[in-house]
């Protein structure tokens, strides 16, 4: 209802400039009606006239749009009368006697506050008649009649009795004027009408007022609520008017109540109207009881008694000054008179019927609303009518009553309330309403208004006890609301709305004395709804009764408290009935403005009335209820819960959504029941702008300025305010018409109430149990649902405003410290499923100096559990035997499927049959089991589902389980129970008889060659045999069409239940894709339904029923196979899939594999992606379950069993899903299964020659990452402590061991990069740290000696240059200790290069063996260059040795062992040192860069010894000490000697001398060795190192010469070596151990040296391989060729250091020790063969080469000593740069030799010179064999191999530095 429309009679713009204008306009707008005038004059007459006119007027209104339009046209005068005195107003408005109405209006206007005018308070004078116009306009064109309110003084216009006087005046002829006035400029019209009304009220009020009072007492139950808004306005003009209208009306109401009972037809115009229209309308809208009650009451309201009743019941009168006395005086009588008036209602029953026709339907009422929406009055009416469906009448009656009651009723019971209630309760029978007349105080009316308030609530009478119910949605705290609620199904609040609506509606429609009040109530009442309606109706706007009181400022004020209580119901009521009124929110602004005025007026009066509303004050926001839809708890007003005025201000439609609904909602119904009253409310809302102003004007006396402010606020607040007390309701006033904005809920009455209730909002709060304390005006609780839930109706949600957000269960903020203190049970999950949890138990603990324990939370026990124990994996899924591969899994798969089927069948519907209706889920459950069974058959028969009798039978049993027992003769008919096939109805399917004429026609057509016509002629005559035969033979293209026709007409005609058979025929006829149309017709799939034209056809059935016959259809097709029938099966699957039957569809797809695509989700052609999962219809669930993946894997497995070429081995798109499954398994702790899936995926990816796009890198990476994580995760615990071996593990272990032994890798050195020989937690430790901790022996100390004199812990430090030695993670391994030390030695050498090594030091080789054996004293460990313990002032001994010692705890690591005698050599060693430096990087010690580079070279080969004991002391390497040995040592250096030689080197450096004899023979080769050493010249590095160390350079020269010789020897040896290598390989391949043995045979003689020079051993093995007989030499720890001569053994023992690139660098260093004590060393060399031969290391230099070399290196120099005397021997030995050599095998021999020679031979210098040579040679050999391996352990290993190759090369004898050495070359 467009309350604000400028054309509205109440609209400010439409207000008349003068009363004359109003009259003119009214006359123009509405033709005066004599009956109306009569009615106006006499209350009884008015009542009758009201009934009549109500009929007419309501008919118009009922018509809705027309009447509303008229109402709009009749600006204020028409609408105003109707609202003013519900019936009377209607009568003037409808009757059309504008003059009468206008006359009445002037009189009333005098009495009535001009504030009642529709115009805003500021715009309109208190005498404004717009109020009445609004009501009338709201109802219909009679708004001109509504002008009677304008002709009535403002006081009369108010909902208070003064409005009644105008009705009387109107009855006398003012009605016609009243019709005219507002048609003019709204402002002028209003002014004119006001003036006229005042004058008329003054003149006619006494008589008319009495009559009006009588009728109004009855009608005003409805009208008063409306009028209550008016009374507020009247309060401005009409204390007198109110008195006239109120007291006189009360008297007349009392008198006329009885009279009206007699005069229903006659009496007061308003009474008649009220009776007729209101009662008729209410009776129509409401139940018959409501109609009767309305009839009974409406006469009284017509007399204005209803107004009193409303005020009394609603306590609304408190809002109006005039109403207070009226309510007090007349409320009780009115309650009684209401029954008298009810007879009028009976008279008006005709109107009721009309109203029923017009408004009985919510939609019709909504229609009115739109019409009213059209005009200002119409808008109000439409808004009101919109809500009238459920709450309009209630609002009219209830609003009026609520105006009376909600004010008093919210918390109080008013006698008048009950009486008014019946009238007001649109949906409550008026009879019921009257039953509650107890409260006499009009302002404390029982909740009776509440009961009627809700239009949709039954019009159960609301007793005074029901005041709280006044609020249709949430009666405040009043008990009565419950009864009302009982009727309404909600709270009493709805009844309040009914009353207001009934009365308001009458006022609105019937032209109550203060129709403007109703509009104002509609608008203002919204505000009051915020206050009163909120009190009555939490939804506020819905409580019309609540609204009306506000218009009466005084009375309303006193009543608002109750009303405030009522407003909650009112608010609720809007939610329920006025949700349609929510639109009234739209006009609500007007109403609220109007009601704001009313509340303002009310506020002064509430002073007296507050007591009733004491509780209601909370509901001051009741105004919002007005705005709130009747059915939605005044959502708009929610924010305005605290103040009704704000909500009312907003146009009734202000809560836009509610406004539209208001018309359809309670307002509509209110109109239907109480046209005038409700119209009044509607008009008020429409007028919200001007009407509110009117109310302000009228209320000005009471509280004009405040109201005025509220008016402005109301539009905004009104919308919110409706939800004030019940903001939730305002919020709830959704767009639903039942949830109109609370303001629109009970527009008129609520608005009126809100005014008073604004003051009384707190009382409302108190009063309305449903609406807790109203939230602040700005507070908007969440919107309430628009449903009619009890909460919505009663305003239960209104309570929400108090606490919109429920308090958290815990008072502590989650982030508060206290909250954090609560115990928690953290849980963490590891990558592979363990879950770690711990609690925080409270434990008593004693603090210091405390005698009492304090209970504190301390870390609890940590519990580690497997996640599968906590969250077990579903057993059926966990037992899946996947990944499925090979026929071995077939049995397990079938067993798994069988178990799954059994478990699934347990959950099936108990009584399933094909004909039993089941839900979609039940059907899918059955089909799911079928899918599992089909898969089991698929696997059992190796991927075959058809083609052999066994499979066919198995499938048939699944698809047609009852087929076997059926009679074979009638399998489909008698067996129809199973198939749903043809039934007896099929008997009707008979082809037409063959007529001779038809056959003749066919014959002729065939003769003419027109076979197509012949075919169709036969088909048309149902000669299907002819047609099919001809088409098949002559026109194959027509055959399918003819077959379709035959199937359609003869097989699958409607009702035959032959869908499956028809589908089979379609398949057989070749219509594969179309055959499924027989199951589900195409029109059904398109969502259409066809209507059969056959009269005999059976009743239509669900077109989807055929879909349930898919199993039967599939069985028919499979049992009758035809060409390409797979396409039909596929089509059937597609059809099923389209209807969400995934399992059934996949069964079909499995049978049509050749026509179905089983592909990825990204492939649009894929029919299914995962078996049992719908990727189209249920994409959100797709792939989220594991079962479909498992079924898909089973399907894939079945395909693989089929073995057909067309069947892919794997379905690539499943790889990602399998990975997902693997992850799930891992998460649940099934590590091994997850690994198996990863392996299967990886295999599938690599097995395909052409990679599938699904096997992309991302998938590969994900699989690889998961595999790595799973492998690192702990294995699942086994039941036994004994590991369960597997063949793979056993075979892998055996072969790995064998291969390692053959290759020499498994010597246990662990120096290899992998350190395989040293399992354990330290196996991967880098930096050369020993894998296994050594005993704290001197050796270890020696290793560290450099840094820490004897302990050299730093040598062990991995952080040092260890990296160089580190190369062998296990460099520390017994054989490779030296190698790692190389790094250390490098570090040390640089520093300690100068530090003399004691002759006792061992060479690196010694160190290696030292690692093998428990090293001797650190001194011995130091043997050679690396006396780590030797505090030799290595520049940075720690750094030097650190790496190496780390790698090798063994002596080598202590490269810096101080070799006392070798000290001189150390200077030479520096030359060698450069090699070590390079190797370990210990150069930090001060080793020259050159050294560093060399050291690296050494480290690879002889990583064990790598660093000469001194930073640059490579010469100290024993290898170099003995010319040959150095060579050997060099090759062996880190890799060879380091790891492997150690064993041979076990003997200490002193032992090698025992091999001296071998060394001597080697002397022959010395030259050659020297020759071979020239190659080491390639060791430019060595030279560089020497350059770096000037001292070594002099030695280098001699070395160069020797190297040249050695190079030649090496070359020769290399050739032999190459041959031997191949032989070794062949031997290795041929007879396994022989290759081993071969390797060892050659080494036999040089066992010790060779072992050290593991690398040379390989070549040696090759040579030995050539020899056929081998034996294992325990001393050499090798297999030795029996046939091999001593030379061979020597060769083996003294393999040159070719591979040791590092040695070469060492040799460069040895250059410094080159003091050619070589000869001395040479002597020592033999011992290495013998002594060292035992030790593996000596083997590397078996011939004593190491010894001799070392000795040669420096018989007197530390280098030579280091080389030859590795430990104890002369200092020169220590100096020997043999470090690199030492690392190979040379070190041990050198050690040995060194000891013997170095010590004895003391040829420290010679050895040193030799060592350099050998080093250089070895480096050259390395070049030949390959670049020296990295300084890392791995490289060292390789170096060992290289050394072996060198050994293989044969034995080379030569002299280095005057020392003979033997070399295998």
From Swiss-Prot:
Biased composition (Acidic residues): 270-281, 360-369, 387-400
Residue ranges with Pro residues bias: 469-483, 724-733, 773-784
GO cellular component: endoplasmic reticulum exit site; endoplasmic reticulum membrane; ER to Golgi transport vesicle membrane
Biased composition (Basic and acidic residues): 344-359, 498-510, 683-697, 1594-1625
Entry membrane topology: Peripheral membrane protein
Matching PANTHER family: RGPR-RELATED (PTHR13402), SECRETORY 16, ISOFORM I (PTHR13402:SF6)
Family note: Belongs to the SEC16 family.
Stated name of the protein: COPII coat assembly protein SEC16
